[in-house]
Amino acid sequence: MHLSQIVLYLGLLIALGPVVLSDQETHQQPSATSPEDTEQCATCEVRQQIKTMRLNAIKSQILSKLRMKEAPNISRDIVKQLLPKAPPLQQLLDQYDVLGDDNKDVVMEEDDEHATTETIMMMATEPESVVQADGEPKCCLFSFTQKFQANRIVRAQLWVHLRPADEATTVFLQISRLMPVTDGNRHIRIRSLKIDVNAGVSSWQSIDVKQVLTVWLRQPETNWGIEINAFDSRGNDLAVTSAEPGEDGLQPFMEVKISEGPRRVRRDSGLDCDENSPESRCCRYPLTVDFEDFGWDWIIAPKRYKANYCSGECEYMHLQKYPHTHLVNKANPRGTAGPCCTPTKMSPINMLYFNRKEQIIYGKIPSMVVDRCGCS
């Protein structure tokens, strides 16, 4: 090789060397995000989208299952005023304190569309003027909806709070049905109880009113309300029928238990993961719903619960079993041609809440907890 050719060859190497070296460095330099990191990041993004859509869906489902067009406009202050300080309600709240939001071994309802009510607590309102004389009595009228009438009554209890007596005495608690003033005798006594009370002690008393409630449901036109009196030996009326200062939550209310439909028990099973799990298959992930974050003060309990959600890959084609499947499709459009990871088993939650009429309802909201995920 001539010297001139060698010089030319070396010149080409020198000229091309930095380019080639630079190109090699470009390929060999570690990337800021490896393929594994990129895939993991994309998976996290999909999960976050699914969680957001699941929360929005839960809002809509609760209102739909409770047959509400929108959430009741009941603030936290109103809740404090309306919430009875009574034994049956306190027992329910104590249950939530003990159980927390544990969803194990829950009971599933056959009705997957609407809430099955167990207990209704109705606050008393002022009777119509036709049964009042000089604006009295101020209490008590209980209203019933068509939905309520369609259910079978198991038990109906009227709860009345008695103010403390000045001395140990016998109190005669009387419950009378009201009639229009024009009908002459506007009081029909239906129940009378004799109660011994101690001095300086207030108490809640319950009276069975199932019979009169049954009459009201069969003949709504006869429901003009009731009058409640609890006279001691001195003629003082100790019954709290309208809230005096410091007596919020002590007004009379009716606790009605109605029959439930058939139900069955389903056990929880399936593949469970946490947010840091590397699992790529269809799996159930934790998701906590916080009603206070929604601004839903009208829900008394639970304040939060574990709803869970499904995410992951599927390999086989199946038919969709639940409407929640479309949430995954929206979050991952590229996967819509194949099977989706979706809830295959769901269970209800027990909820204590105010409806739009400011009645306290305790019931089951079906299909609110994801128990198991699968491909469909």
Swiss-Prot record:
Gene3D superfamilies given in the database record: 2.60.120.970, Cystine-knot cytokines (2.10.90.10)
InterPro entries referenced in this protein's UniProt entry, alphabetically: Cystine-knot_cytokine, TGF-b_C, TGF-b_propeptide, TGF-beta-rel, TGFb_CS
Cysteine disulfide partners in this protein: C273-C283, C282-C341, C310-C373, C314-C375
Proregion residues excised on maturation: 23-267
Coiled coil regions, renumbered to chain: none
Gene Ontology BP annotations: negative regulation of skeletal muscle tissue growth; transforming growth factor beta receptor signaling pathway
Predominant location category: secreted
Keyword list, A-Z: Cleavage on pair of basic residues, Cytokine, Disulfide bond, Growth factor, Secreted, Signal
Induction: (Microbial infection) Myostatin concentrations are decreased in serum of fish infected with nodavirus as compared to serum from uninfected fish (at protein level).
Tissue: Highly expressed in muscle. Also expressed in other tissues such as eye, brain, gill, heart, head kidney, stomach and intestine. Low levels in spleen and liver.
Domain of life (superkingdom): Eukaryota
N-terminal signal peptide: 1-22
Gene Ontology cellular-component annotations: extracellular region; extracellular space
Location(s) in or outside the cell: Secreted
Pfam families assigned: TGF_beta (PF00019), TGFb_propeptide (PF00688)
A single MF term (Gene Ontology): protein homodimerization activity
UniProt subunit comment: Homodimer; disulfide-linked.
Family listed: Belongs to the TGF-beta family.
Task performed by this protein: Acts specifically as a negative regulator of skeletal muscle growth.
Name under which the protein is recorded: Growth/differentiation factor 8
Lineage, broadest ranks: Eukaryota, Metazoa, Chordata, Craniata, Vertebrata
